[in-house]
Amino acid sequence: MTLGEMCSVQRGKRLTKRDLNHNGRYPVFHGGIEPIGYYSSSNREANSVMVINVGASAGTVGYSSKEFWSSDGCFCFSHCEQLNQKYLFYALQSMENSIKGQVRKAGIPTLDNKVVEKLKIPIPSLAEQQRIVSILDKFEALTTSISEGLPKEIELRRKQYEYYRNQLLSFAQPLPKT
C-alpha cells in the first residue's frame, strides 16, 4: 500500500518573517527539522511526521511530539487509524536516503509530493507497529544517552586521572634538618 493511499500528504501553509515572533507558542518548521521561529497558532497536531520538501534539507524526515506550524517547506501526513505516526516516522527515516535521491537538484532542491505519495510503507497491525516503535524508541534513547553521557563520563575520568596523578606525584616534602 502506498503512503498516498493510507493518508493524505499535506503541504503546510506559508508564513512570512513578519508573522514569526519570539513569544509564539508553536515552533514553525520550514526547510529544516529545526524551527525557524514561533507562531501564535498551530496547524499540525502533536505526534506528527514531516518531510522537508524544499532547500538543502529536502527529503529529511522529522517528527514533533508537540503541536507546531508546518510551513509550505514541509509535507505532513493526516493521522489515520491504521497508522501510528511514530511508526511512520521510523519507516520513512529508514527510506530517507532513497527519498533524498529523488529530490530535484536544479536551482533550489525540491521534493515533489508525488514521490512521497508513491512510497510503499509496510503496514503491520497497530499492536506490531507499537512494538516496533517501543524497541526503536529504546535504541534512540540509548544512542542519545551515549552521545550525551559519554563525553561527561570521559570528562569525569579525566578529572579522576588528574587527581590520582597529582596525588602520586605530590611527594611529601622532606623535613628540614635541624
Language-model segment annotations:
Residues M1-T178:
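Charged, alpha-helix-forming regions
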